Amino acid sequence: RHASHPMATRRTDEAFLEELTHLLITTGVSSLTIGEMAQRMRCSRRRLYEIAETKEELFVHVCRNVLEANLEKGYAAARRAPDAARAISAYMHATLNATGLSKAALTDLDAIETGRKVFDDYQLARVRGLESMIEEGVRQGLMAPHNPRLVSEAILGAAHRLRNQQFLQQTGMKIGDAFSEFYELILNGLLVRPSAPTP
């Protein structure tokens, strides 16, 4: 049967990895065996073992690729922005959904030592990217000269909390609306600015 349908079994490595990525970032890895993965992917176990020696290593490999792609998406969005303030907004919007990893996948990643390091490295890279954009905003005279590390940590900390489903349910907000309002708060502050006097 396989011989008569070569196209059905000869997915490119890129297409195969894309399908595998979707499976693992949706389901996580703790509930799956290599055998179940092979069955779901309609492939041999050997093809999975060619990527990594264990299911945990396979999962971490996939997650690392997703996180790196997510960072690059954020940087690309920032590069297209006309100034530093809009670059920060574009960067955060582009990295909005914590990489597309489901709650199950994030939980599994946190439970694996190498997975925690991968995610910590990703968060650190996000902070560093944000810091450089804030520094550029100060140089452009668009932002007040606050400590860039403090501001970037505050933004990322809030981003983590704003994704919380309980918070979103309690406020009745959608995640995109919550982030938009938060960015407005960061860029414009809490204080009402007096209107310019009419001539």
Residue ranges and their predicted role:
Residues 11-40:
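Short, amphipathic alpha-helix enriched in basic
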Residues 1-3, 128-139, 164, 171-199:
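C-terminal peripheral helix-coil segments that are non-catalytic and often amphipathic
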Residues 61, 72-101, 151-155:
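Hydrophobic alpha-helical connector segments
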Residues 68-71, 115-140, 149-154, 164, ...:
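Amphipathic alpha-helical packing segments from all-alpha helical-bundle domains
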Residues 107-116:
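Short linear capping/connector segments at secondary-structure termini
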Residues 25-29, 42, 49-61:
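HTH DNA-binding helix-turn interface
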Residues 87, 93-96, 144-165, 177-189:
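Hydrophobic alpha-helical segments that form the core
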